[in-house]
């Protein structure tokens, strides 16, 4: 793999994270309750941290052993609501987040098999694993919320 290709993929991933930050900032502006705004700020910070991690990959590269396995609770796969049409209840914020992270996970997973270059494939699998962690974060919040009888 050419170094330029690696850098372009990382830049693409950073741009997607910046889109996610804007997404959460936009939701903060729409949120009606302070606790919702605080949660959205935490999510924004999580995405900012992901940018930092991706930027470090510019220097360190990525190896197979860097890819962590994240169990898939599959909650978002069973939710059929269009996240764009949902209001900003706590439940719907979680659904929007789950669906966004699921989309990113699927994109990076698909890209990992489309490129024959092992280094590019490993990079996309690493990015997919990070998105899977974010998705699981939302699914855990959603699961906890549902268990409380909501």
Predicted segments with their positions:
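Non-heme di-metal
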Residues: 1-150
